[in-house]
Amino acid sequence: MPKHAQVKPHLLYEWDYEKGIIKPKNKRCPRCGSFMAHHLKPVPRWHCGKCGYTIFEK
């Protein structure tokens, strides 16, 4: 059994074949630059697992 789950690119990126652009679906962390996770419970927020930066939504 692998230690980590395989990354599924179709869940992380959006493709625009007409323009030839690939964009990430999630936000980037302003502090370290890695992808942020969107959590809905208990409070909606964006959180960076690498550096701990959190953005709370209103």
Swiss-Prot record:
Zn(2+) binds at C29, C32, C48, C51. Belongs to the eukaryotic ribosomal protein eS31 family. GO terms for molecular function: structural constituent of ribosome; zinc ion binding. This is Small ribosomal subunit protein eS31. Part of the 30S ribosomal subunit. It comes from Ignicoccus hospitalis (strain KIN4/I / DSM 18386 / JCM 14125). InterPro entries: Ribosomal_eS31, Ribosomal_eS31_arc, Ribosomal_zn-bd. Keywords: Metal-binding, Ribonucleoprotein, Ribosomal protein, Zinc, Zinc-finger. Binds 1 zinc ion per subunit.
